[in-house]
Amino acid sequence: MINKIHGKVIEKKESSLVLMTTVFEFELLVSAFCLANFNLSDKVELFTYLYTRENELKLFGFLNSDEREIFKELIGVSGVGPRAALRVLSNIRYNEFKEAIDKEDIELVSKIKGIGKKMAGKMFLHLQGKLLINSELESTGLFRFKELEESIVSMGFDRKIVNSKIREAFNLAEFANLKDSEKEQFLFKEVLKRISN
């Protein structure tokens, strides 16, 4: 899985950015908020999601892992494709969308063109209680290990379980005695071991 792309913006289109990396050029479909965030020649880092179907292969780019996580949850809703998911994230910022879900503000989402109350209702039913913004790690003092969390989640593991196992490993006496340079490798191995058990 392609987790992130680092590159230079060489073209801005209506709903995508073209990035030049060391070797390749990538076109990434992005939300309107993401598009507005960058100018030509900017050096950027985008989280990515590769959408694959029989006759379709598209790469989506996101400002951060939270925006990507919401996108992934949205396309898991029956009847919501990647274009509709991106339309939602182009009309409501990802943190505002999370807040709307928590407050059951269906009206806000249903006003988006092409969504409507029925589809918004399906989204709310599917997403309530599933969205994590800035990761639970931030509230536990473990935010510096967020990249480690992302690496393990990108391997296909559930984010909540990964968060839980990182906290467990973090609280081990063995972890406290390690040098800073050794801690991330220890956490990675320990978390994978605990998830597999």
Swiss-Prot record:
UniProtKB keywords: Cytoplasm, DNA damage, DNA recombination, DNA repair, DNA-binding
InterPro entries per the UniProt record, alphabetical: DNA_helicase_Holl-junc_RuvA_I, Hlx-hairpin-Hlx_DNA-bd_motif, NA-bd_OB-fold, RuvA, RuvA_2-like
Renumbered residue ranges of the record's region Domain II: 64-139
Biological-process GO terms, alphabetical: DNA recombination; DNA repair
SMART domains: HhH1
Location(s) in or outside the cell: Cytoplasm
Top-level taxon in the UniProt lineage: Bacteria
Name used for this protein in its record: Holliday junction branch migration complex subunit RuvA
Name of encoding gene: ruvA
